[in-house]
A protein has these predicted regions:
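Phosphate-binding glycine-rich loop
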Residues: 1-35
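Short, intrinsically disordered, charge-balanced linker/junction segments flanking boundaries
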Residues: 1-5, 78, 82, 198-203
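Hydrophobic residues at beta-strand termini and immediately following loops
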Residues: 15, 60, 136, 149
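Substrate-binding/gating loop at the entrance of the active-site cleft, primarily
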Residues: 16-20, 24-27, 37-55, 64
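A short helix->loop->beta-strand "cap" motif at the edges of active sites that frequently abuts
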Residues: 34, 55, 113-117, 142-144
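Active-site phosphate-binding strand-loop segment of PLP-dependent enzymes
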Residues: 58, 62-130
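Conserved core segment of the aminotransferase class I/II
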Residues: 139, 144-203
Length: 203
């Protein structure tokens, strides 16, 4: 649907909501002292999750003059030799801002130039109206340096069921799954069946 294709055997991890996916991705990628760029306003758990794994959160405030979209200039100004990960969420909560393909292509150039990894929280992707949602992971050379997070809470109004999806390179998903299996084991069976019904129902 969003031009993303992953091997379900080793490139997809089912999590207890996208929130667990955020935590797992950060813990798999971030070493103590690494800087993580966080686009704000942001989901409440982003910065605490960065801090819990020893990372240093660096805020990138979105500007109304840019329609709350992240620009390549804003991103470039925050990058240092310690920067490792860019954490973004578009469509954004609470601004509702979306990143169009041209916006993401400009961000892609900066990410590649500085060898960054991207965690992209796309939980609101299904709530994009009037235009097709574009994932930065679908752009050339970005597949191998992105973890895409999504879930069922927003698209299917299943907040309490705690069902999330993390998709990315097999090596990263492998390390995320190692943490997942010793902390959570698995998402609830009943929730998985409910999610399957949501995905396959003709309604």
């Amino acid at each position: 649907k969003f031009d993303l294709h992953y091997d379900r055997a080793d490139e997809i991890l089912i999590t207890m909501g996208a929130s667990e996916g955020i935590d797992l991705a950060l813990r798999a990628l971030v070493d103590p002292g690494d800087e993580v760029l966080v686009v704000e306003p942001a989901y409440v758990s982003y910065i605490p999750c960065v801090e819990l794994c020893g990372g240093i959160p660096v805020s990138i405030p979105l500007q109304a003059k840019n329609r709350f979209r992240l620009t390549a200039e804003e991103l470039g100004e925050k990058i240092t030799e310690r920067t490792k990960v860019l954490l973004i969420s578009f469509p954004n909560n609470p601004t509702g801002a979306i990143m169009e393909k041209a916006d993401l292509e400009a961000i892609r150039e900066v990410v590649l130039a500085h060898d960054l990894f991207v965690i992209t929280d796309e939980i609101y992707a299904e709530l994009t109206y009037g235009k097709k949602h574009v994932s930065i992971a679908a752009l050339p050379d970005m597949y191998e340096r992105c973890v895409v997070l999504n879930g069922f809470s927003k698209a299917f109004a299943m907040t309490g069921w705690r069902m999330g999806i993390a998709a990315g390179p097999a090596e990263v998903i492998f390390h995320m799954n190692k943490i997942h299996q010793f902390t959570t084991m698995s998402a609830g069976t009943t929730s998985q069946y409910a999610a399957l019904e949501a995905l396959t129902s003709p309604v």
